[in-house]
């Protein structure tokens, strides 16, 4: 049945009546029933529907697999959305499989003649029973005579919470009921992530990755979680959390306005609230939403500020425990107190303690509830308790106190609570603040005076500096060993490019524009004109000239010369007739001009150029900005690596280096380089892996989004490879020009290159061997998937990012 649905959908892809035809087909293929009894089991091809027509129970499979599951899904919605699976760990494979109700009220799934693969357990019904699918989506086993519910699916949750279903705990019995993610989007067996609520007072929600906290909601305050600022006073909460006298707590979800809504815990650890709009699923909430949501990202006594990008800070009176770790963007060691507390209860002397209040805070973990009538009493109770480090009086909760490390704290742009932190009085010295204000005022005054004075000198010297600048550039270049480098005059380049006309413009990148030109001797050239706002300064400009002039290889672009005049900086290259690789791979028409054999030749050529840079040249070069737009193609479609402005040269036995100024292109940067500034041969290997998957798929890393969950290119490539469907990643424009084995091998090589740990990636020599031989390949480990922006927009083309030298790592796009 799934195959027929898929076939019909493809045939009616551009027809407005597709959904009607699909629905009509399902009437003839699927036999619907009102209930399951001992006399009437559920077989493959049959469904059990709820009376309101919203849900149905039936058999289903993924990608036309032989493995069949029994599950509940939304009726009439294509593609199928499964909200509960009975046999999530044991699929059936026999076409004679059926779901039956036994005489004792136990619901059992038989795999044909192979026995029972799943059971609801012993229900012990004495008068017979039946199975119904309620309008809420709850599958229930009911005793026929008494009407007593013997078993229900809402007490055995999967990865989805439906309206009226509950997450719960019981203090006395230790029972817990939560959500458990699927292993993958096509494997419903239990995955790595679990959602639970805690039995503390007040309760809070936890998203766990194994046994480790991954995300925390903050304590519950009557109608909202304090760690979710979206739940403000104007928010009509569809949630409730209640406790009964038996020590049980129930977290319930209701959506009165939409029968087709759900909350899902995805295989990659994201909680999504989804509502069906008649055509598609709208995401009304998704978390974790950013790095601040990850549990304990800023460590003890640190807090994460939600900004663009998020960053960690220490509370007033605290300093980073490890400055070096904070500089690299690793904040998990947290902060330590600068001035030791001397607890004297109500003392008013120099050793007295005071409170510093921080607004818009997600309350930290490890809180304790204290009975207080108001905020003033809450503060006094904390002051009288020497172990109390902070307090908060929260509407809907009351007084919370902290005597342990303040962990997993976030500061929102709006919303949140007031957190008061206990400090030594010296941290809030009034006189010290006054001195600071006076010093700032005097400094600003002097700055303004000096500014006006300097402005006068600047105006008289600006023309003089322009002339000096050109001589300085030329002198610097002459001190370098760059034989054969030609120095061009500006008027020569202006004539060659028709004064940099738009008709001569070949493209635009992060450092400026590239123009086609023709010299008087007939030579065709490409001119890279650095923009005045370019981040490529003197160092990068010199770097590119010196490096490229000393490198000679058929797969590297050749620089002919340069031109410096005033503020203008130009690089002159050999002209590449076919421009850059991205103009073919990502263009709907031109991609047809490069079939699979040609793409495979280009892949091997890039690898040879990379091997020359890393191993075979007299200089060892790390490119640091390898991407599709930096691969140029000559008239014979031979690839040439270009743009060496960010390249670094290694000497002797050096194999890696570290920088505090991280510059590169979003999506191509390896994890260790993006977040710690560490680069090596393996950084370029990671970029090559991304580039390889782009060439295979014809999809751009920064724009690709697959399926309802919006999977990235790396995530989709991993899913295809895990399912032995590597050929599914292939660009459809390639048709039958490829060999499936060769494509699958290249997908596996790409995944080996983008592994998280640099040590797991192949070196360049191993990479070229993998591409040119048929030797066995190692199995890749799951890569780190890049997360799309929350507004659904892709970054701009080849967006560059910079991590500046700060104690708080900040990322800027360019």
Swiss-Prot record:
Gene3D superfamilies attached to this UniProt entry: Bulb-type lectin domain, Phosphorylase Kinase, domain 1, Transferase(Phosphotransferase) domain 1
Keywords recorded for this protein, A-Z: ATP-binding, Cell membrane, Disulfide bond, EGF-like domain, Glycoprotein, Kinase, Lectin, Membrane, Nucleotide-binding, Phosphoprotein, Receptor, Serine/threonine-protein kinase, Signal, Transferase, Transmembrane, Transmembrane helix
Chain ranges of the Protein kinase domain: 500-785
EC numbers, comma separated: 2.7.11.1
Keyword Glycoprotein: yes
Glycan attachment points: 63, 104, 127, 246, 330, 346, 385
Active site: 625 (proton acceptor)
GO BP of this protein: recognition of pollen
Region CaM-binding, annotated ranges: 589-606
Signal peptide: 1-34
Family membership: Belongs to the protein kinase superfamily. Ser/Thr protein kinase family.
Regions that span the bilayer: 437-457
Catalytic activity: L-seryl-[protein] + ATP = O-phospho-L-seryl-[protein] + ADP + H(+); L-threonyl-[protein] + ATP = O-phospho-L-threonyl-[protein] + ADP + H(+)
Cytoplasmic compartment residues: 458-814
Cell compartment(s), UniProt: Cell membrane
Protein name: G-type lectin S-receptor-like serine/threonine-protein kinase At1g61400
Cystine connections: 292-304, 298-312, 378-399, 382-388
Membrane topology qualifier: Single-pass type I membrane protein
Sequence positions bearing Phosphoserine: 534, 549, 629, 642, 702, 796
GO molecular function: ATP binding; calmodulin binding; carbohydrate binding; protein serine kinase activity; protein serine/threonine kinase activity; ubiquitin protein ligase binding
EGF-like domain boundaries: 288-324
PAN domain residues: 343-425
Pfam families: B_lectin, DUF3403, PAN_2, PK_Tyr_Ser-Thr, S_locus_glycop
Modified residues (Phosphothreonine): 659
Binding site for ATP: 506-514, 528
């Amino acid at each position: 049945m799934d195959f027929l649905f898929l076939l019909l959908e493809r045939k009616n892809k551009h027809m407005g009546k597709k959904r009607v035809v699909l629905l009509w087909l399902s009437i003839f293929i699927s036999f619907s029933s009102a209930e399951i009894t001992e006399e009437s089991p559920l077989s493959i091809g049959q469904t059990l529907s709820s009376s309101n027509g919203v849900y149905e129970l039936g058999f289903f499979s993924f990608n036309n697999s032989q493995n069949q599951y029994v599950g509940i899904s939304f009726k009439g919605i294509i593609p199928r959305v499964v909200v509960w699976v009975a046999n999530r760990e044991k699929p059936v494979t026999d076409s004679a499989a059926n779901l039956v109700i036994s005489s004792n009220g136990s619901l059992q799934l038989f795999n044909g003649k192979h026995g029972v693969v799943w059971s609801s357990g012993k229900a012990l019904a004495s008068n017979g029973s039946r199975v119904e699918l309620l309008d809420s989506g709850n599958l229930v086993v009911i005793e026929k005579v008494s009407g007593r519910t013997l078993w229900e699916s809402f007490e055995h949750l999967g990865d989805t919470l439906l309206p009226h279903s509950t997450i719960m705990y019981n203090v006395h019995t230790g029972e817990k009921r939560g959500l458990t993610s699927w292993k993958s989007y096509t494997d419903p067996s239990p995955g790595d992530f679990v959602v639970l609520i805690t039995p503390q007072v007040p309760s809070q929600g936890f998203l766990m990755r194994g046994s480790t906290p991954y995300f925390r909601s903050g304590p519950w305050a009557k109608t909202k979680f304090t760690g979710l600022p979206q739940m403000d006073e104007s928010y009509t909460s569809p949630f409730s959390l209640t406790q009964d006298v038996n020590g049980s707590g129930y977290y319930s979800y209701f959506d009165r306005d939409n029968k087709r809504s759900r909350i899902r815990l995805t295989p990659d650890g994201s909680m999504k609230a989804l509502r069906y709009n008649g055509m598609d699923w709208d995401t009304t909430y998704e978390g974790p939403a950013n790095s601040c949501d990850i549990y304990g990202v800023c460590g003890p006594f640190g807090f994460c500020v939600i900004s663009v990008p998020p960053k960690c800070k220490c509370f007033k009176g605290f300093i980073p425990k490890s400055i070096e770790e904070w500089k690299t963007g690793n904040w998990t060691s947290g902060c330590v107190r600068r001035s030791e507390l001397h607890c004297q209860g109500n003392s008013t002397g120099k050793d007295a303690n005071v409170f510093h209040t921080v607004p818009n805070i997600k309350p930290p973990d490890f809180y304790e509830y204290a009975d207080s009538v108001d905020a003033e009493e809450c503060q006094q109770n904390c002051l009288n308790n020497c172990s109390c480090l902070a307090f908060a009086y929260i509407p809907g909760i009351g007084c919370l106190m902290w005597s342990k490390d303040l962990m997993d704290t976030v500061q929102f742009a709006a919303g949140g609570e007031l957190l008061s932190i206990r400090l030594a009085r010296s941290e809030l010295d009034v006189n010290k603040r006054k001195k600071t204000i006076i010093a700032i005022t005097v400094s600003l005054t002097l700055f303004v005076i000096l500014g006006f004075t300097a402005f006068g000198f600047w105006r008289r010297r600006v023309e003089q500096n322009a002339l000096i600048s050109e001589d300085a550039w030329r002198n610097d270049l002459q001190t370098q060993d760059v034989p054969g480098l030609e120095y061009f005059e500006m008027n020569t380049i202006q004539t060659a490019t028709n004064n940099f006309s738009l008709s001569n413009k070949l493209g635009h990148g992060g450092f400026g524009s590239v123009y086609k030109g023709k010299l008087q001797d007939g030579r065709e050239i490409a001119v890279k004109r650095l923009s005045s706002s370019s981040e490529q300064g003197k160092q990068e400009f010199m770097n590119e000239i010196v490096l490229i002039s000393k490198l000679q290889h058929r797969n590297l672009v050749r620089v002919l010369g340069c031109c410096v005049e005033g503020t203008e900086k130009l690089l002159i290259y050999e002209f590449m007739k076919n421009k850059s690789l991205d103009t073919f791979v990502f263009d709907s028409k031109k991609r047809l001009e490069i079939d699979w054999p040609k793409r495979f030749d280009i892949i091997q050529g890039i690898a040879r150029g990379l091997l020359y840079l890393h191993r075979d040249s007299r200089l060892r070069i790390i490119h640091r900005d390898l991407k599709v737009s930096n691969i140029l193609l000559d008239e014979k479609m031979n690839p040439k690596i270009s743009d060496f402005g960010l390249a670094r040269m290694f000497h002797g036995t050096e194999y890696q280096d570290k920088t505090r100024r991280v510059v590169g292109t979003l999506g191509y940067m390896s994890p260790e380089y993006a977040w710690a500034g560490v680069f090596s041969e393996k950084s370029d290997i990671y970029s090559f892996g991304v580039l390889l998957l782009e060439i295979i798929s014809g999809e751009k890393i920064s724009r690709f989004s697959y399926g309802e969950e919006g999977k990235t290119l790396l995530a989709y490539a991993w899913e295809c490879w895990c399912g032995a469907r590597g050929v599914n990643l292939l660009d459809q424009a390639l048709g039958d020009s490829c060999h499936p084995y060769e494509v699958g091998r290249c997908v596996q090589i790409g995944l080996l290159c983008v592994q998280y740990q640099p040590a797991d990636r192949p070196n360049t020599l191993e990479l070229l061997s993998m591409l040119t031989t048929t030797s066995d390949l190692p199995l890749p480990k799951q890569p780190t998937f890049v997360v799309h922006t929350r507004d659904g927009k892709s970054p701009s083309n080849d967006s560059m990012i910079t991590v500046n030298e700060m104690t708080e790592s900040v990322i800027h796009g360019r």
